[in-house]
Amino acid sequence: MRRLQCGRPEERRPPAAPPMVRFVLLAAAAGGLLWAAAAEPDSPMTTSTPATGPSSPLSIQQLQTLMDKLRPLYARLGEPEPGDWLYHHKEPGQTFRQYVASDPVRPVGKRTVIYIQPLGEFTDAQRRIVTLTAEFLGLYFNRPVKVRDDVPLSVIPARARRTHPTWGDKQILTGYVLDEVLRPRLPEDAAACLALTASDLWPGPGWNFVFGQASLTDRVGVWSIYRNGDPSGGEADFRLCLLRTLKTAAHEMGHMFSMLHCTAYECCMCGSNHRQEADRRPVALCPECMAKVCWATGANPAQRLKRLAAFCQAHGLEAQQRFYEKALAILK
């Protein structure tokens, strides 16, 4: 299994390179055991977002032409500072054409639905974040989304938990969630299944925490709301938590469709090594990564931007709304 993540390694030593690639939004490492026993999928509680059916899938060249129009709108990545993701993790990046040539995981055949798997308990405000994130992912990836019935944290055994030795945070092991909770429960029509938890995440030895982690090949991922702030603290706090959660969810879902970290532009698919770096990343995809999503899902770029702008307007994400509207105006 190939995995990606973003996250915070322990300060005392660099993490040993594991035998697989991983991906997460803010802290990460892989690990985990394979579970051979299969289980019947749980019947999901569906809060569906219908697919935003495109007029017609665009060709690679048509997408390339449209994305070239958008390039002036996006900031190129500068030299990373000490502590930033790319300062510590040298990554090659991935162009749109490299992505197409890689035979990526994408929604094909009967595998067309994105599933959100709540893991553990949530407050009412956190539950609303889950619902809005499901709606956003449907618009972002042009897929119907179903939210499944909750799975309790009691499914995580003691060997896949720890208390952080310095901070005291209670954490669950991401590899166990991917391999032993999600993979055996993967529905037959799942384009991807992404677990969301209010628990802190930990990917294994050498790492302090991760915001999320996903498999590049197995259609499963997990991300956490734990470090995104308290959404019940007021409207501004709710919007901040929502935006952070949307970024992580979109980033991890991108990995589940075989998208690597972006190294060219300020982009939702950039790796992040700490909270400040994650907060300065946009929720929007750069031209290269947007082309990947539109090609993989059959989304019409202009329709996608219009729907995302409307979502941001409805939920008070004004800066994000303005950006999507600027991009839409260029394509028109």
Segments from the language model and where they lie:
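Metalloprotease/metallohydrolase-associated module, dominated by Zn2+-dependent proteases
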Residues: 53-74, 221-239, 243-244, 261-332
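N-terminal low-structure segments adjacent to metalloprotease catalytic domains
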Residues: 37-186, 190-192, 196, 304-332
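Low-complexity, Gly/Pro
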Residues: 1-7, 11-52
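A short, structural micro-pattern
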Residues: 110, 187-188, 216-217, 263, ...
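Generic domain-boundary/flexible-linker signal
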Residues: 125-127, 204-205, 280, 297
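Active-site-proximal segment of zinc-dependent metalloprotease catalytic domains
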Residues: 183-252, 256
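Surface-exposed, flexible loop/turn segments at secondary-structure boundaries
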Residues: 122, 201-202, 294
